Swiss-Prot record:
Natural source organism: Chelativorans sp. (strain BNC1)
Name of the protein in question: Adenosine 5'-phosphosulfate reductase
Gene: cysH
Residues at which [4Fe-4S] cluster binds: C124, C125, C205, C208
One Pfam family in the UniProt entry: PAPS_reduct
Alphabetical list of InterPro entries matching this protein: PAPS/APS_Rdtase (IPR004511), PAPS_reduct_dom (IPR002500), Rossmann-like_a/b/a_fold (IPR014729)
Amino acid sequence: MAAKPKPLDAEIEALELDARYGHLAAEAIVELAVNRFRDEGGIATVSSFGADSAVLLHMVASVDKSLPVLFLDTGQHFGETIEYRDQLASDLGLSNLVVVHPKSEMLSARDPGNDLHKSDSDLCCEIRKVEPMARAVEPYSAWFTGRKRHQAESRAQMPVFEAVGPRIRINPLARWTTADQAAYMRANDLRENPLVAYGYLSIGCFPCTQPVKPGEDQRSGRWAGLAKTECGIHLPGLEALTNAA
């Protein structure tokens, strides 16, 4: 039986990968990461099927349409997002969509009225996103995200390869701009989440998402009026859970 990867091993590997490959084009990063990790613990991609999701999914599909695509169904997504998820997966021929749900017992105990977001948005995200995310990535050695540095100040220094506990998180689009995103969407005739047309430039659960006002950053419509800027699936809370996995 192979030894379980240790967080320090992942930290060293992520630094080495970022130094060696972090400068490459996004498509090249996706291809080399799939080839590296597919048979070494496995690799998946996490997607919200939100405003910017189509680009990374198209790149993944170009390499391996059977790669697991992990979608966190919080139970509070816009109906448009669920419909878009199914349409885009069909467009791209993605054959391994994995839908992950919150634990029903946690919802019953902590959010029986489906209104926890009003009183404790952090706990709501922990139950509906962070804990399910930790379960979703547990079988894999690495996973892709579509995060970009320009999206928010909290992401400005984000590396392409980074360690999360004993696993590697890969952000192939880290250096991309909104112009890069738009050009790729046009060049490949990719379907867009219909909510984008209504000003939703970052799309999460419907109670905590609103259209972005002119001049604001893309994620300003998330948890508007709160200091909160991330749901937690990209923060240290996830690392603590994945370390325990």
